[in-house]
Amino acid sequence: MSKKIVIIPGDGIGQEITDSAVAVLKKVSDKYNLNLEFESHPAGGTAYDLCGTPLPQTTLEAAQNADAVLFGAVGGPKWDNVEPTLRPEKAVLGLRKGLGLYANLRPIKVADALVEYSPLKEEIVKGTDVLIVRELIGGIYFGDKCESEIYEGNERAWDLENYSVPEVNRIVEFAMQAAKKRKNKVTSVDKSNVLATSRLWRRTTAKVAEKYPEITLENLYVDNCAMQLAINPSQFDVIVTGNLFGDILSDEAAVLSGSIGMLPSASIGKSTSLYEPIHGSAPDIAGKGIANPLATILSAAMLLRYSLDEQEAATCIEQAVDKALAQGYRTPDLYKEGFIKADTKTMTEAVLKHI
C-alpha cells in the first residue's frame, strides 16, 4: 500500500529545497521499497497570488488526508503590504490548527564535519545530539489576553498561562517514547519555583515517568537549562517543555550547529504530521540555485522516522548527509576556502550518491 506525501513548497527557495528533498525521498523509496507517492499543493504568498488566500481549502484537505506533509517556507517582501489576515505566514498557523499539531520537534545535532562552524569551542559542542520536544498548542501563547485596560488608574496588559493535565500527559508521553529510541534520558524544563502551571507540569511529568522505569528523568529550571545548553550541551538527550520555554530554548540551541541551513524540524499531529526546515524563504537568493537543501533533506528523514516508522531509511539519509559533508561539500552559507563549493543541485547529488 502506497504512502501519500503532500509537498507544500511555499515561497522563495521553498520550491528548490523541497525538490531536493523529494529527489532524496524517491531514491530511498526505491532502495527500501517504501512505495511513496507525492502530491504538490500551494500555500503562502504563492497561494495568495493564485487563489487570494495563503491556505487554500484544497491544500488543507490534501494535508489532512496525507500520511505526512513536507513543507518548504513562506513569506517575502512582495507580500508585506497584504492585509494581515492574508499574510503568507497565516498558512503555517492554519496548517497547525487544521492538522492539530501539538508537538514541535527540534533535533540539534552537530556533525563532526561542521564543529568548527559552531560559536562554541569544539570540546564543548562536539557530540551534541539533542531533541527538543516543545508543546505547541497550549500555554501562554494560546491563553486569554488583554492588550490594554485601565487598572487602578494605570494602563496594563496581560496574558494568561494555563496547562491541563491531559496536555502535559500527551507531550511528556511523546518525549518518553522518543527517548526510548535514543539514549533513555528525558530532561523536563519548567519554572516550578515560581509558576503554578510549572508545578502542575512537574507533578504530571513525574506520574508519566513512573510508567517508564528505563528512562532517566531529570528536572531543570528553564534559566539553568538555558545556561547548560551553552556550557555543556552534550549532556542532554531529550528535552521536553512548554510552548514559551520551548520556543526560546530551541532557538538558543539552533545556534550550536553554526548554520540554520542544517536544522530540520517536525510538528506532530494526531494523525498527520508536518516536516520543515527551520529557516525562512530567503527571497534574496530564490531562483539562484544556491540554497542549502540539507535542512529540508533532514526534515524528510524525520518524516520517515516519525510518520512512517521507517527507521533504517531515515538513518540512511542522515548518514548520506554526514558523508557528503565529510567529503567537503559546502553550500555558500557554509563555504570556506579549502572546501568544495556546491550549489543546491551539487549538494543534493552529493547526498544522493551515498544512498
Region annotations inferred by a language model:
Residues 137-138, 143-182, 186, 192-194, ...:
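Glycine-rich phosphate/pyrophosphate-binding loop and the adjoining helix
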Residues 21, 25, 205, 296-307, ...:
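Buried hydrophobic packing segments
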Residues 113-115, 220-227:
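Short acidic loop-to-helix transition motifs that present clustered carboxylates
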Residues 49-158, 244:
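N-terminal glycine-rich phosphate/adenylate-binding segment common to multiple enzyme folds
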Residues 6-23, 28-29, 152-223, 235:
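Glycine-rich phosphate/diphosphate-binding loop of Rossmann-like nucleotide-binding domains
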Residues 45-48, 229-329:
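Glycine-rich phosphate/nucleotide-binding loop
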Residues 11-14, 67, 133, 175, ...:
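Buried hydrophobic positions in well-ordered alpha/beta secondary-structure cores of metabolic enzymes
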Residues 33-57, 227-229:
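N-terminal beta-loop-helix "entrance" segment that forms/cooperates
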